[in-house]
Each structure stands twice: as C-alpha cells, then as structure tokens.
A protein has these predicted regions:
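Active-site-proximal beta-strand/loop segments in catalytic clefts of secreted hydrolases
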Residues: 77-79, 102-106, 128-130, 166-170, ...
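Sec-dependent N-terminal signal peptides of Gram-positive bacterial secreted proteins and lipoproteins
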Residues: 1-33
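Short low-complexity, flexible loop/linker segments enriched in glycine and/or proline
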Residues: 115-117, 141-143, 205-208, 271-275
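Active-site beta->alpha N-cap acidic-glycine motif
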Residues: 47-138, 142-157, 248, 255, ...
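Catalytic grooves of carbohydrate-active enzymes
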Residues: 219-258
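Low-complexity, Gly/Ser/Thr/Pro-rich intrinsically disordered linker/tail segments
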Residues: 251-275
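Sec-dependent signal peptide cleavage junction
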Residues: 25-49
C-alpha cells in the first residue's frame, strides 16, 4: 500500500517536472522569437544619412529585376537652366541617362527653350523657388507661394504643372511644420537628397581638378540601392564631372533615371511621408 502511494507520488512529481520543463522551453522559445522580431524591427528602422549628416525619410523599397535588386541613381540639378545646361543635356543624351532639374523662376523666363528641351528629352522639370532666399522662403513663410509662382512659369512653357519641389538649402530646418502643412494642402511634393556632390565648394579651383573631386564625392557616397544626387548645372565643374559620374555609377550597377510623379517616394530630412 505504502509502495503504491510512493509510486503514485513519484509519477505525479515526474509529470510536474516535465510540464515545468516544457513551459520553460516554450517561454524561452517565445523569448527567442521576440528577440528575433525585435532585432528584425531594429534593422528595418535603420535609415540612410546624407552627406550633410541629416537622416532621411525611408526610401521606397527597391524594385527587383531577374531576382536582383535594381540600383537606381537620380542625378538632380538645381538653380538652372543656365549657360552650361545645353552642354549637360548633350552629355546626358550621349550617355542615354535621364536627370531631374529644379529650376529658378528667373531662369525659366530667361531660357524657355532649354526648359522645353529638358522636358522633350525625357528629363523631369521641377521647382526650386523664385528667389532662392532663405529669409523669404522660410522665415517669412513664402515657400509655397514661390513654388506655385515658379510652377506657373514652367506650366506656361510646357503646358503642364509639375509637383516636385527642391527646397533651397534643403528642407531642414527651414521647412517647418506649418510650411509643410501648406505644401501638402497645395498638392506639392518635396525632395531633398542622399548624396551632396559639394560641387559649389570648388568654384575657385581649376575646372579639371574640381570635377575630379566631384566625381570622387559622388561615387564614394553611392552605396545604397537608391541614391538622389545633388548637383548644380550653373557651375562648369559640375557639368564637366557628369560623364565620369555616369561612368562610375554604371560600373556600380546603377541605372540613371528621372523622377516620375507616378512612382513618387518620400525623401525629405523631416521624415514627413505626406510630401
């Protein structure tokens, strides 16, 4: 009798121990899954940083082709059109590369034929303000007003109204929440950049040496599947650098495309996905 009771007690204890081990194992397994999920989420939250050390909004997931991630580079040129723009367009045409141009209103008036050519050759034409004046655009709050005026000038030349703007000096810190709300209300979009070519820094340097530095800056920064490159077609060294940049980007596997309104993805220093 006593032996039977002891046997029953031992069996119960064994069952409890097994249950405890199973519970501990499942809890541990759950912790592992939780930790993995946490690590995965942290990895997904990593964001790229621009050359001016300002982190960007997440980029659009790269498209795939034949199982490979497509690498796309967007050459963008601010402040034109100008006296070097025709030469730049010749280079782009020769290399079968597309670009995005952000125009100053006064230059739209001065070079309407270049605006037409940019559009006709498959490039995107967007707005870069009327004055390029920080105080007027941001402190006095005229960002949208100037972009709409610039938009109207472009529409007068091309017969269509683009929506993409490039903030003079970048969107941070000037494009505050109130101005961003106004951007959204007016149906405009904003693009900053992922790579700053720093082309303007070399205005006093000999053109060949300056262009070599610009090529180096761009290719060194091109490490992600999607890159948006800031340049200016009003500087001779910038235009001189373009063939080398295109060659280097193609060697890295990039395709050179123009912005497409139907495939817009947010790219601004404020992480504001509305614009």
């Amino acid at each position: 009798m006593h032996n039977g009771i002891r046997m029953t007690t031992l069996v119960k204890r064994a069952m409890l121990i097994c249950a405890g081990v199973l519970f501990t194992y499942e809890a541990a397994l759950g912790s592992v899954h939780t930790a993995l999920a946490s690590t995965e989420n942290e990895a997904k939250s990593v964001q790229f940083v621009s050359e001016i050390q300002t982190s960007l909004a997440p980029k659009e997931a790269p498209k795939h082709y034949n199982g490979q991630v497509r690498k796309v580079a967007y050459l963008t040129f601010d402040d034109g059109p100008g006296k070097y723009t025709a030469e730049l367009l010749d280079m782009l045409k020769k290399e079968n590369a597309k670009a995005t141009f952000f125009l100053i209103g006064s230059n739209v008036k001065a070079f309407p034929d270049l605006v037409k050519r940019e559009d006709a050759e498959g490039h995107y034409v967007g707005m870069h303000s009327m004055t390029h004046n920080y105080k007027k655009l941001y402190t006095e709050g005229h960002y949208v007003d100037e972009m709409k005026e610039d938009q109207g000038l472009i529409a007068g030349v091309l017969g269509k109204s683009p929506v993409l703007t490039r903030p003079s000096y970048g969107s941070m810190p000037g494009l505050n929440e109130a101005l961003r709300n106004k951007v959204v209300e007016n149906g405009l979009k904003v693009w900053d950049w992922t790579i700053d070519s720093l082309d303007w820094r070399y205005n006093k340097m000999q053109v060949d040496a300056a262009s070599a530095k610009i090529v180096e800056n761009v290719l060194h920064g091109a490490t992600n599947p999607t890159e948006v490159i800031l340049m200016h077609d009003i500087h001779p060294q910038s235009v001189k650098a373009v063939p080398g940049i295109i060659k280097g980007l193609k060697e890295k596997g990039y395709e050179l495309e123009a912005y497409n309104e139907n495939e817009h993805f947010p790219l601004n220093f404020w992480h504001d996905n509305r614009m």
